[in-house]
């Protein structure tokens, strides 16, 4: 935020105009800002100034806050280090977004939960919704899962897995093998995935600093 403050001051001094620094009033549909992000010209931009951030911005080409939120989330180890069919979930997301790969869902019941992220598990909230849908987790159980993911509690995750598999088998939406595969995605997200509210807040700051 300090770099954003300095940018505003510089603009005012250079052009002799008063720049409205109220970041809450910046339009979120400014093409020049999105072009800058999509071109990877993001040095000094919150969350996107690293080489990885610039590279993924050029590949994912976000054009709104929701897509920018996804980009920030798939930069985390949960997606970067989860390898499925020879490539990371990060690259699966990007390739599906760019129509290089077809969007597919491991099970049709996951479509409403994962449709916004091209069938890829990106956010903690999605993991919780999957546990609710597939295994019938109640709010307390879902909150335990959230803490296990957010705080990387391996011992807690092992207990949650046992409960998930038992409840999923009892509910009968998916087979035991399918439940094990689905939970393996959730386990991978334990390596560090974002909750969506956090990621959206970061996306807003990224856009504002790019602006």
Language model segments and positions:
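Mg2+-dependent phosphoryl-transfer active-site scaffold
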Residues: 1-194, 201-210
């Amino acid at each position: 935020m300090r770099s954003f403050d300095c940018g505003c001051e510089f603009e005012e001094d250079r052009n002799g105009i008063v720049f409205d620094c109220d970041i809450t009033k910046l339009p979120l549909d400014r093409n020049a800002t999105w072009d800058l992000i999509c071109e990877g010209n993001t040095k000094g931009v919150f969350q996107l100034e690293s080489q990885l951030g610039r590279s993924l911005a050029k590949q994912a080409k976000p054009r709104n806050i929701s897509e920018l939120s996804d980009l920030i989330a798939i930069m985390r180890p949960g997606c970067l280090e989860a390898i499925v069919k020879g490539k990371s979930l990060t690259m699966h997301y990007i390739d599906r977004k760019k129509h290089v790969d077809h969007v597919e869902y491991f099970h049709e019941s996951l479509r409403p939960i994962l449709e916004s992220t091209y069938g890829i598990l990106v956010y903690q909230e999605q993991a919780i919704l999957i546990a609710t849908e597939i295994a019938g987790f109640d709010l307390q159980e879902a909150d335990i899962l959230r803490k296990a993911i957010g705080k990387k509690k391996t011992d807690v995750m092992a207990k949650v897995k046992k409960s998930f598999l038992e409840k999923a088998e009892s509910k009968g939406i998916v087979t035991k093998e399918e439940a094990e595969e689905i939970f393996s995605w959730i386990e991978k997200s334990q390596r560090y995935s974002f909750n969506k509210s956090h990621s959206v807040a970061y996306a807003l700051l990224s856009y504002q600093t790019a602006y």
